[in-house]
C-alpha cells in the first residue's frame, strides 16, 4: 500500500478504487490507512446520495470512532474522538453561502490541529481548501451498491 502513497505524492497521479458495497470495504480501509501517514485533509466529491457520508462513517469506524456518526449538514462540522488518531473533524460545506464562512467557524484552527479532516462538498470552500488535500471523487452506480473512488492529489 505504500506504493499508492508514493504514486499520489511524487507522481501526482491518481488511484482508482472500486468498493463493491459498504459491507465490503477492507480494500478501502487499507488504502486510507496508508494515506493517513502523509495526509490529514481528505475532500470528498460526489452528487447527492453518492455515499460521501457513508464512506466517511466506514473510515471513522476503522479509526476507532465509537457511537453515532452523522452528516454535519446543519452544524457544518462534527467532532469525533477516535481510539487510533485522536480527534477527527467531519465537515459538510454544502450549506455554506460564502467560503469566508469557514473563517467564522475557526477553519485555520482545524487545519493547524494535525487532526484528520474529512470534508464533504469541498468546492464550497473555495480557496480555503489546502493545496495538499487529497480529493476523493465518488461515482455511484445507483442500480447497485457499487462505488468507484478516484483519489487525486
What are these model-derived regions, one by one?
Residues 33-39:
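Phosphate-binding P-loop
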Residues 7-31:
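N-terminal pre-Walker A segment at the start of P-loop NTPase domains
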Residues 42-44:
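Hydrophobic anchor at the beta1->P-loop junction of P-loop NTPases
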Amino acid at each position: 500500500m505504500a506504493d499508492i502513497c508514493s504514486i499520489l505524492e511524487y507522481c501526482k497521479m491518481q488511484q482508482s478504487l472500486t468498493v463493491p458495497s459498504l459491507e465490503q470495504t477492507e480494500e478501502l480501509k487499507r488504502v486510507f490507512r496508508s494515506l493517513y501517514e502523509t495526509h490529514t485533509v481528505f475532500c470528498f466529491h460526489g452528487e447527492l446520495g453518492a455515499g460521501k457520508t457513508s464512506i466517511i462513517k466506514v473510515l471513522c469506524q476503522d479509526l476507532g470512532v465509537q457511537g453515532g456518526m452523522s452528516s454535519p449538514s446543519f452544524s457544518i462540522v462534527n467532532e469525533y474522538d477516535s481510539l487510533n488518531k485522536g480527534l477527527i473533524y467531519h465537515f459538510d460545506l454544502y450549506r455554506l453561502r460564502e467560503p469566508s464562512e469557514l473563517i467564522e467557524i475557526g477553519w485555520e484552527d482545524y487545519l493547524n490541529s494535525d487532526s484528520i479532516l474529512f470534508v464533504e462538498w469541498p468546492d464550497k470552500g473555495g480557496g480555503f481548501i489546502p493545496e495538499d488535500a487529497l480529493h476523493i471523487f465518488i461515482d455511484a452506480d445507483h442500480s447497485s451498491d457499487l462505488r468507484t473512488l478516484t483519489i487525486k492529489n
